[in-house]
């Protein structure tokens, strides 16, 4: 870090997402000075909030791992507001702020939150750098945030290329057992030695479905169709995050093994990277699978990310299927999966080589911490 003594990192996923309206009982609101005072008052009664108190740290810079937190939805995402408050606070303390590896996007399921954007403008303009992970976010930043030091680097997860492609191979479940599988004998029987296909959910399932049952029914139909059309392959569901919890019901209904949410991330990455095809509306799992050359069939998501990653990977056709596919769309997904599998190693090599390029590019992002505005 050169002259910097210490750097604070904010990690997203700490804060509950979803439809959130500010409450009089909560510390966060659109007035960040008031929010900071409220936070400090809340700490005695809620000690877990103490980590957010920047006064306790001896630091020179705050580095924000932006990822997918900054989707400008109405009502606002809570994690977006809290991370913005921390950036505001750090700048007020005279500290440097680096916003890295971020996405800036509209929410396809609500009105664009201009109030949040206006609140962020002075914060972003004071930051040392605003670095986004794909071209869609770069253009969005150009349109909405003036006077910022804007940079573009691929998602940091591409830097895992060497780890995903080392010599260790996962052939069965005993090497990747998470807590949920600790007493599950069937988990030991997971067979990754023969060709297999992976399926996960999408970040848009909650917004697109009327209820949990609708999502379960649609994905059960999809999974059964895939199993029927690809009898020569093992089929695995992948519970990527809490939003994919409904896949546990799909697993029971369709009698399909599921790779649980608590499975070690590197193990899941290797499993996805060696799948013949990955059907998903998830961004980071798609990157993990691509690192091994696995072609992805994308369903829509809660932002532009499932389109932007296809452009980043230089897909010949940019295509998103409905997050809750009907019978015709399921048939299209099956057709696309078969086409991609039949392209074999030529397609896999093309994807993998592109990921190697992106991994070499994203590693350069660390140099931003040594640069001056």
Map each language-model feature to its residues.
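Active-site anion-handling motifs in enzyme catalytic cores
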Residues: 1-373
């Amino acid at each position: 870090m050169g002259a910097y003594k210490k750097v604070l990192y904010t990690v997203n996923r700490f804060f509950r997402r979803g439809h959130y309206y500010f409450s009089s009982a909560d510390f966060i609101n659109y007035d960040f000075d008031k929010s900071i005072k409220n936070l400090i008052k809340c700490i005695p009664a809620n000690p877990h909030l103490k980590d957010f108190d920047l006064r306790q740290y001896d630091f020179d810079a705050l580095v924000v791992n932006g990822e997918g937190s900054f989707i400008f939805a109405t009502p606002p995402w809570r994690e977006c507001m809290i991370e913005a408050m921390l950036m505001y606070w750090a700048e007020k303390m005279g500290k440097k702020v680096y916003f890295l590896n971020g996405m800036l996007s509209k929410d396809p399921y609500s009105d664009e939150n201009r109030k949040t954007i206006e609140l962020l403008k002075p914060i972003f303009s004071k930051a040392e750098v605003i670095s986004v992970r794909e071209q869609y976010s770069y253009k969005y930043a150009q349109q909405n945030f003036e006077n910022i030091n804007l940079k573009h680097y691929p998602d940091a997860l591409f830097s895992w290329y060497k780890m995903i492609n080392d010599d260790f191979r996962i052939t069965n479940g005993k090497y990747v057992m998470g807590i949920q599988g600790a007493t599950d004998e069937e988990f030991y029987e997971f067979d990754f030695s023969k060709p297999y296909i992976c399926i996960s959910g999408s970040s848009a399932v909650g917004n697109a479905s009327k209820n949990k049952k609708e999502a379960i029914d649609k994905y059960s139909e999809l999974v059964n169709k895939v199993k029927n059309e690809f009898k020569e392959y093992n089929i695995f569901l992948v519970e990527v995050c809490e939003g994919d919890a409904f896949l546990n019901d799909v697993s029971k209904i369709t009698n399909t093994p599921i790779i649980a949410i608590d499975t070690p991330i590197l193990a899941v990455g290797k499993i996805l990277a060696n799948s013949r095809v990955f059907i998903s509306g998830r961004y980071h799992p798609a990157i993990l699978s691509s690192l091994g050359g696995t072609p992805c069939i994308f369903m829509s998501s809660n932002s532009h990310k499932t389109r932007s990653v296809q452009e980043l990977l230089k897909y010949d056709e940019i295509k998103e299927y409905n997050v809750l596919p009907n019978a015709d769309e399921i048939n299209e997904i099956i057709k696309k999966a078969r086409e991609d599998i039949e392209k074999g190693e030529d397609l896999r090599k093309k994807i993998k080589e592109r990921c190697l390029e992106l991994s070499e590019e994203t590693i350069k992002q660390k140099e931003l911490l040594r640069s001056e505005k």
